[in-house]
């Protein structure tokens, strides 16, 4: 995507960015709450069939990515880059979830800003 710098900290994008596909997955507890109908996938427990929290988080990210690519549709599901982050051990879960993809991975560690940071970087 072509960009143009406007000053030191502002970038104007030649074409507006868009989100081709998105998904969210949750554990049993969230699935029992008032937002249950809003989730794409609710696991039967919080472990996603795994034995550790790290493996569970990896499985959760892999499921969310697979669903997002599926919802994006043919052609849109091709990844050029993968931006992901988590709060667990400096992106361990994100790194392991991303290694199955055939594209460059950018690990983000921005705590609460990870989503906004990822969207901004991916737009460029």
Predicted segments with their positions:
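Active-site-proximal alpha-helical scaffold in enzymes
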Residues: 108-124
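Conserved "HGTGT" condensation-loop signature of ketosynthase/thiolase-family condensing enzymes
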Residues: 1-106
């Amino acid at each position: 995507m072509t960009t143009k710098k406007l000053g030191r900290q502002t970038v104007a994008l030649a074409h507006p960015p868009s989100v081709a596909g998105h998904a969210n997955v949750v554990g049993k507890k969230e699935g029992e709450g008032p937002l249950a109908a809003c989730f794409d996938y609710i696991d039967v427990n919080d472990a996603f069939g795994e034995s550790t929290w790290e493996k569970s988080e990896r499985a959760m990210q892999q499921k969310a990515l697979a669903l997002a690519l599926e919802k994006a549709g043919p052609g849109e599901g091709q990844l050029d880059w993968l931006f992901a982050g988590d709060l667990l051990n400096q992106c361990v879960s994100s790194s392991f979830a991303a290694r199955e993809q055939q594209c460059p991975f950018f690990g983000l560690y921005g705590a609460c800003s990870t989503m906004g940071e990822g969207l901004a970087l991916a737009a460029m």
